[in-house]
Amino acid sequence: MKVLLFCIVISLTTLIASGQDIEEELRCPGGYCVSKYLCPNGTFIDDIKRAQTTQLIGLRAGLDIDDFDVCNDYLLVCCQSAPAPTATSTENPANSDELIEPPPSTNLACGQANEGGLIYDLRNNDTLSQYAEYPWVVYILALKKQSNSGDFVCGGTLIHSRLVVTTAHNTDGKTDLVARFGEWDVSTTKEPFPQQDIDVAEVIKHPQYVFNPIQHDIALLVLAESVQYAAHIRPICLPQPTDEFVGQRCVSNGWGKERGVYANVMKKLTLPVIGRANCTRMLRYAGLGPFYALREGFLCAGGEDAVDMCKGDGGSPLACQTESGTYVLAGIVSWGIGCGGFNTPGVYVAVNRYVQWLNEHIVDQALNESFDIKL
């Protein structure tokens, strides 16, 4: 009886696997659905619904699969030959989820984006970042007790191999924080390069931080160990105390809400930095009343129709590019009225006002680290 039951289980498993193989064969005839980086150059099948002629990924809001995603997974491509083997994998390539080691970061300068991203290319895309495009953005979680999982807390920015900067209010009442580096799409584990999860050993809030009315909303997360820099994990540069960004269009990233739903793929919004007087006027008309004045330590960005950061984006960076192409951390998402919109800018921590405080803690922690800063 036991032998018969064992045979039935084996048969069912074989049938399921065969069904999966047949389904994949129909989607990707003569090939395998694999991660793009496992497919040798030039071996994309190029006669299926035009999808592989462009070697671009179709992606819409909410990660819907469009008509050109023949593998039913936007991170997979139809590859006409067996994929390139990895050093540790001997599995059937169609079933392999092996990650490859990312190339080391040969450019040790801070503030260097991967323009256009790595590996993938999202098409028809205006508000999502490319994979590893902004390697300093950090996904911060709070671990659940008696569980290996965690809840998303906020965004952060890598400024040093042991330091992440974020907003103070997002850390209020939070314990067991973990900083995740190299995150992009929170709905999948099929990203090509491995993430690094590192415990937060200490949270250092600005000594003058006040929640209500909010002031000096900045905090440092000291990591339990150094993050390992790679092509998809690199720090951003800090600004100079005298830097001003009014009139520039800068980039903000995060996984906050969009149309009421938290984003899976890291967002990318390009926003104008607005002068203090203009921002104060806009916020007064937006509902804060005729006597409101923007406090020192904040700057404003946005104020455009249907483009702004939202709930869940707190702590995320506002990065501005210098003439040389280097990015500096101009702001940190702090607060706003609703999710912003036309004539309702978002409010960010003005990082240039806190550079001295940040540098003092870098010295106090004996964490001196030199970069080739291209200004």
List the predicted regions and their residue ranges:
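Extracellular trypsin-like serine protease catalytic domains
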Residues: 42, 49, 53-63, 137-149, ...
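Short, structured beta-strand segments at or near domain termini in extracellular proteins/domains
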Residues: 75-80, 219-222, 351-361
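Conserved H-D interstitial segment of serine endopeptidase catalytic domains
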Residues: 112-116, 136, 140-143, 164-167, ...
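Gly/Ser-enriched beta-turn/beta-hairpin loop segments
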Residues: 128, 132, 189-194, 210-215, ...
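Active-site substrate-binding loop(s) of clan PA
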Residues: 192, 204-210, 226-270
